[in-house]
Amino acid sequence: MVQDTISDLFIRLKNASHARLERVEGIPYGKYQEEILKVLVREGYIKGYEIEEKEGKKYLSVQLKFGPGKQPVLNEVRLISVPSRRIYAKKNDIPKVMNGLGIAILTTSAGVLSDAEARQKGVGGQIICYVW
């Protein structure tokens, strides 16, 4: 049983992206993971995802996105908040990742948002990770 499902999700996506796999299957479903995937779709880091059911359990299947020459769009994910150490940012202190080339994913009172969406809505929250 995986203790930190968020880090498991990102490790699977990053490894599959570096291996240039089109699809990642068998990711255990969680509402929080689904919200993170919605942000990655909105920001253009993955093509999409599906929820599948096998033997009464739900799983996520993610379609990865690649650029010209099969270069992965999702290059790196750096986890910021982990279960033993939570990092928060106020609305004015949300960092820009790679000078705006990447995104930060935050969990806020308005849901799971990218850094740009959080700034636009004027909310801060827990920084989950940086993606570029």
Curated annotation (Swiss-Prot):
It holds the Pfam family Ribosomal_S8. Keywords: Ribonucleoprotein, Ribosomal protein, RNA-binding, rRNA-binding. GO terms for cellular component: ribonucleoprotein complex; ribosome. GO terms for biological process: translation. One of its GO terms (molecular function) is structural constituent of ribosome. InterPro entries: Ribosomal_uS8, Ribosomal_uS8_CS, Ribosomal_uS8_sf. It comes from the Bacteria. One of the primary rRNA binding proteins, it binds directly to 16S rRNA central domain where it helps coordinate assembly of the platform of the 30S subunit. Part of the 30S ribosomal subunit. Contacts proteins S5 and S12. Belongs to the universal ribosomal protein uS8 family. This is Small ribosomal subunit protein uS8. The gene is rpsH.
